[in-house]
Curated annotation (Swiss-Prot):
GO cellular component entries: mitochondrial matrix; mitochondrion
Protein name, as recorded: Short/branched chain specific acyl-CoA dehydrogenase, mitochondrial
Signal peptide: none
Annotated positions of the N6-succinyllysine modification: K70, K284
Pfam families hit by this protein: Acyl-CoA_dh_1 (PF00441), Acyl-CoA_dh_M (PF02770), Acyl-CoA_dh_N (PF02771)
Gene Ontology biological process terms in this record: fatty acid metabolic process; isoleucine catabolic process
Location of N6-acetyllysine modifications: K70, K284, K426
Amino acid sequence: MEGLAVRLLRGSRLLRRNFPTCLSSWKIPPHVSKSSQSEALLNITNNGIHFAPLQTFTDEEMMIKSSVKKFAQEQIAPLVSTMDENSKMEKSVIQGLFQQGLMGIEVDPEYGGTGASFLSTVLVIEELAKVDASVAVFCEIQNTLINTLIRKHGTEEQKGTYLPQLTTEKVGSFCLSEAGAGSDSFALKTRADKEGDYYVLNGSKMWISSAEHAGLFLVMANVDPTIGYKGITSFLVDRDTPGLHIGKPENKLGLRASSTCPLTFENVKVPETNILGQIGHGYKYAIGSLNEGRIGIAAQMLGLAQGCFDYTIPYIKERIQFGKRLFDFQGLQHQVAHVATQLEAARLLTYNAARLLEAGKPFIKEASMAKYYASEIAGQTTSKCIEWMGGVGYTKDYPVEKYFRDAKIGTIYEGASNIQLNTIAKHIDAEY
């Protein structure tokens, strides 16, 4: 009878013969993927480059972060409850965003912008979201979608016309989603038919953020449905254009101060000069801007979760039950430590994606990771905070229930969580 060791050895040899080729020999150097992390590691190893911690900021970034924190606490915080209850953003808040230079963060000073970094935009959104996620997304859309698309793809005339307005007084709105085109956004049906020097738009849009206040709409419409998504083109449409109808704002669970409206286009004539970029490239522009926007949404969810956490911890340090603080119970301490660790992980994912974008490195996978994780953690954090505060956390007398309601949208808009997972998996497949 063969000994056990012999049988095991034979079994291991047989198993080894059926291993995937990537595991055929332990002597072969491990496969290095083409991910941005691997590239960064190789750069450090080969070139001796020193990288500062992700939470190291320039003096300008620190100044912006500090001033936005002060603005949010002093001018936005007192109005949050009223804006949420009335589903209306106060004009003073919108004016304050423009006056603070927060509606044109990356726009060149030549056009009235701040001329700051993309990470500055992320820090601004994070700080605003700590106080009100509605105000944060209002600022996020303007900066990461509207301004970015015009800066990158606009003609000199378009930039000269619209950027000075967008940095000082005019709100922009991004119009992609439709009733039958949500996650499958390129199934949109809005048409743009050429008539002389104009394009005539017909169709409808849904879930359009900031529509109630917008003076400029960046509209995706198809100039040739026979070629599918390759006919999608971007148009700049002014609010007062005849035939453009803005519907009643939706009555939403969260982000109630941020208007979300349906739009209808009935023979809306748009000059050919208002095409943004090239005809048929709208789908590329939309994908590119949404990839960047996902980092902005990650920052929004991160800030929201951190704001809720910051409000809750002082309460559980003061609340006495069974003769001691809630915070002194080890079971609760472990929950707090777990949530704090998740928040830090979400922050590092978000900042890393922003740094990669600024460095001109591939960032799409990292943006999806940041958006996915920050959104999921925001939901978990706000839920835990309500539990820790108990009954008072469940009432509208305290802001934690609003944080909880606001957090849910993170797993839905600018790419649902499952879409982010698809994107991440697609990149992993390509890397290996």
